[in-house]
């Protein structure tokens, strides 16, 4: 985290919002390291509906312990459900949301518009549903118009902009929406737009939008 006396923070103007530092974590060691080094929140996947199924992930059983640890240190935890959901999977996905809410997760980062709409409606009719809805970078929100369209139907508490945007494009989005925006400042870029790549599916029948990206764009070709 940037020290409080850092000139970047001291130059914030009245009314400016201090950025939230969000870090990924795949296990408790990573979570502890993120907390120890000043993260305001962490994001992580579980064993389903997660774009990084082949990475180290937490389990449903470990989630309550993780959330207790995070909240004891004033840190939030957001669960990634950043894949496309098949219609046949929707009941399981909704049950997942219920479990995440009961376990104390602060929010979910969602790609699928249908699932996002379901969570919006659930939150509106049931005050006990406390999960915040965050739009994933996989939702491909690239413009003020896209943000405006999404906000008509979804109660977004935060939107992760597509990773491919320039600083000028990010600024334009920020000027035209009241939705808090999140951007990646470190990490890999997709060869295509976030959430729109079909290369892995076309070449190896492993969909990047289902957590199975084979990273075909990084393979050597003769």
Q: What are the language-model segments listed below?
A:
Residues 2-141, 161-165, 169-222:
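Active-site pocket-lining/capping segments in soluble small-molecule metabolic enzymes
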Residues 143-146:
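Conserved nucleotide-cofactor-binding alpha/beta core module
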Residues 157:
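Long, basic N-terminal domains or extensions that often function
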């Amino acid at each position: 985290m940037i020290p409080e006396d850092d000139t970047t923070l001291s130059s914030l103007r009245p009314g400016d919002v201090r950025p939230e530092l969000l870090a990924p974590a795949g296990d408790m060691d990573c979570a502890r390291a993120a907390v120890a080094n000043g993260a305001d929140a962490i994001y992580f996947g579980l064993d389903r509906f997660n774009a990084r199924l082949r990475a180290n992930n937490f389990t449903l059983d470990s989630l309550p312990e993780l959330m207790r640890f995070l909240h004891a240190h004033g840190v939030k935890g957001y669960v990634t459900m950043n894949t496309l959901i098949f219609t046949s999977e929707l009941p399981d996905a909704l049950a997942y949301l219920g479990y995440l809410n009961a376990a104390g997760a602060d929010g979910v980062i969602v790609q699928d518009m249908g699932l996002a709409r379901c969570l919006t409606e659930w939150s509106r009719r049931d005050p006990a549903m406390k999960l915040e809805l965050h739009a994933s970078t996989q939702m491909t929100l690239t413009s003020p118009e896209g943000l405006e369209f999404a906000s008509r139907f979804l109660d977004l508490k935060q939107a992760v902009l597509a990773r491919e945007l320039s600083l000028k494009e990010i600024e334009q989005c920020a000027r035209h929406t009241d939705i808090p925006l999140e951007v990646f400042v470190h990490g890999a870029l997709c060869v295509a737009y976030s959430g729109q790549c079909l290369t892995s599916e076309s070449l190896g029948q492993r969909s990047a939008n289902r957590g199975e990206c084979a990273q075909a764009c990084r393979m050597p070709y003769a």
